[in-house]
């Protein structure tokens, strides 16, 4: 199978122009076929504030009411996505920006209300992997925004890590897929205050041991759960690394 790299970027990397420029330059130099998935939550919060719309969060997750949905659609599908696409075009990549509604490549169900009503948030139910694979095969570099749709005319805010994981899993039918999560740390750390304490490789038993000991906690737990789900679904390798280490043999490998 031909190799494909699916890379997810978010946080400060997307928000700061100089950092994003450097990352996209590194991304453009990665050999073979590739897909970029981006976040943009901080930009959405900043624009919402300017518009007088309060951003509500529960455990780090955005509550997406009707007004907030308008903002995240504008910011993710417009401002952030198209800036990235234009930058990649300038670097010689034939990039195409997509939300799940575009070409109906990814559908979701609106998350049911349980303890918390997250509003217009989507849980992915279907990925048109053959469509994405066809685009990739023609030399297109998909740039995926963290938005899906329900097939009934409604856009849904969807976690970028989830978009990356679901796309990687679906595309593993067509390619030998490596999934890379880029963020501000060098990888999964033994000591969150020591950026050099990177755990080079994590297996499921080691993950469970580190969770019990409190070494791995917070937002890293769902990120690793998504990583193991991707491996179980056919993704060859998952890497968690720092953005400026992209393309290097570094970070934490999940097997």
Where are these regions (language model features)?
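C-terminal catalytic "cap/lid" subdomain
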Residues: 1-255
